[in-house]
Regions:
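Short helix-capping/linker segments at secondary-structure and domain boundaries
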Residues: 56-59, 162-170
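Charged/polar, solvent-exposed surface patches and flexible loops
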Residues: 126-134, 159, 180, 184, ...
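Surface-exposed patches in mature extracellular/periplasmic domains of secreted proteins
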Residues: 140-144, 168-173
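Active-site nucleophilic cysteine motif
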Residues: 141-164
Length: 205
């Protein structure tokens, strides 16, 4: 991965949806074919995102992934359900949020137009790392938060970027690609920031 020892950095990786997994990739293509037909547009390549953050505390990988086993060694800080809340009672239908010290991004070799440096500010890196356990954990693949888009791994990453104070709207997807769920994270982050603003103003008066 990209960052060198002794530096602070936030790097974004774009991975083709289902990299290394043929069934996920096929399902993604079917989903995009249907979405493109409904929206009367051309089909796009679909991408999943992950972050590598280097700060004073070390190097961390931040990603949402299936919770297929106990997560202590992967720095799991939160879990959520896949499909329905009831399904989440079974481990097979759970996802996990990782803040993994010295971790790895699976299939990083297949990343496209990556890494993308978002910041080299130490305070921003620390703030983003502190935010990871606070991320919302709605049901994956559903729009429980009423954003107009389903919540998924891209929502996690865009939420963190927005909440950490970086310019999330300037983050471009790979050429010819889409990142379903990206907008959902931004919408929720902006809502939370708007709610916090009046409280901050009142407290300073």
């Amino acid at each position: 991965m990209s960052s060198s020892v002794g530096t602070s950095a936030i790097d974004l990786y774009w991975l083709p949806l289902g990299a290394g997994g043929h069934s996920v990739r096929l399902n993604g293509r079917i989903f995009e074919w249907v979405a493109a037909r409904i929206e009367h547009r051309d089909r796009c390549d679909l991408y999943h995102s992950a972050l590598e953050v280097r700060g004073r505390e070390g190097r961390f990988v931040i990603e949402q992934a299936p919770a297929w086993s106990e997560g202590g060694e992967r720095g799991v800080v939160a879990v959520g359900s896949v499909g329905t809340r009831a399904a989440g009672r079974v481990q097979l239908f759970r996802y996990e949020i990782r803040r993994w010290r010295d971790g790895v991004i699976p299939d990083v070799a297949e990343a496209v137009e990556s890494p993308r440096r978002l910041s080299d500010d130490a305070d921003c890196a620390r703030r983003l790392l502190e935010l990871v356990p606070q991320v919302p954990t709605p049901v994956w693949g559903r729009d429980e938060l009423h954003t107009g888009e389903m919540w998924n791994s891209n929502s996690l990453i865009s939420w963190l970027i927005a909440r950490s104070g970086l310019d999330v709207d300037s983050v471009a997807r790979p050429t010819g690609g889409r990142a379903p769920g990206w907008r959902a994270g931004i919408v929720v982050a902006h809502r939370e920031q708007a709610k916090a603003a009046p409280a901050t103003t009142a407290g300073s008066g």
